[in-house]
Structures are given as C-alpha cells and as structure tokens.
C-alpha cells in the first residue's frame, strides 16, 4: 500500500496553523462544520473509549456569554463563527484529558486544512474574572451533566488576520534528547 497523501502537506499544515483570535463575520458552511466535527470523532482515544462529547455553539448571545469564561484569553470567542465546547466523561476514562486534547487539535488541524482559523481556549483549571471556576461557569451556561468535565472551547471562523508561518529558526532543538536526558553544558553543575 502506498499513500497518495504527500508528507509535505502535513508539514505545511503544522507550520502554517497559528492561533487566530480575529475572525470575519462570515459563517461556516454546514459542510465545513461537518468536516471539523468528523475530525474530532475520528481522533484516536485510549482503548477506543471515546470519552469525549462536543457541544457546537453558533448562537451569538451564547458565544458572548462563553467569552466571559476566563479572566483573560477568552474574549475572541465572541467574534468567532462557532465554538466547540470539548467535554469528556471522567468516569469513562482516566486519560480523558489526553483523549479530549487529541480530538481538539484534530479539529484545529482540519480547520486549517479548510483555510479556516481556530483558537484554543483552556477551561480546565482556569477561573473567570470573579474567580469562579471556569468549568463550573461553562457547565452552568450549557446544562452540562456532572460526570462531564470541560477541557476547552475551540473557536472557529474565517481569519480576519494573517499570521506568518511558524519560523523554524525558533525551533528549540535543545529540548530534544537522544537516548537519555542530557543537560546543556552551560547548565551542568561542576
């Protein structure tokens, strides 16, 4: 079997996918939304338990409310075309954080492949401006049952800003170790 997909396309995808926090008013097509959600549902999960659930939010009033889910770093949700709230059942899997994270990035990579922008809004272990737990805030807004935890909210839309691709000159190769962990020479104690 020989894959017809060129590896250059994936390398280009990960180099060009950057967080987008400014979106146009253009809505996503149903086909685009379906492709993004399919990517999430195809994501690998430990023991194929698939502990994740997804809430798709297109309602502008709800997006505005969700934008208040954190003290900082969530205001972009008000301007996105739609957001996907990423949940996971903590009773189904002890690695729900990892499984839901993989599904989240699959959606973001699919969006980039479609020419769309996205941005991850971390919810787990974060607080609102009045110090309410962000998970509790989102849970109350969307009537989320107790066994589900909110990991993140991913905002999607057409990009209203262009960002340069990731500069490979900034790759931190010093964080790669061969065969065992090795301290950089300048950090070793004598």
Feature-to-residue mapping (PLM):
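Acidic, surface-exposed loops and disordered segments
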Residues: 3-190
């Amino acid at each position: 079997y020989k894959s017809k997909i060129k590896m250059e396309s994936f390398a280009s995808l990960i180099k060009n996918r950057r967080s987008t926090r400014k979106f146009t008013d253009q809505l996503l097509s149903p086909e685009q939304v379906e492709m993004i959600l399919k990517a999430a549902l195809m994501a690998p999960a430990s023991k194929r338990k698939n502990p994740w659930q997804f809430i798709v939010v297109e309602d502008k009033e709800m997006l505005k409310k969700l934008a208040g889910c954190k003290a900082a770093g969530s205001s972009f949700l008000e301007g996105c075309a739609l957001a996907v709230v990423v949940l996971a059942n903590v009773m189904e899997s002890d690695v729900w954080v990892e499984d839901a994270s993989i599904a989240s990035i699959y959606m973001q990579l699919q969006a980039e492949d479609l020419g769309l922008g996205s941005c991850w809004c971390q919810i787990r272990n974060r607080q609102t401006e009045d110090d309410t737990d962000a998970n509790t805030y989102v849970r109350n807004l969307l009537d989320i049952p107790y066994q589900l935890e909110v990991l993140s909210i991913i905002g999607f839309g057409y990009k209203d800003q262009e960002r340069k691709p990731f500069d490979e000159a900034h790759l931190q190769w010093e964080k790669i170790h061969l065969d065992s962990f090795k301290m950089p020479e300048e950090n070793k104690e004598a």
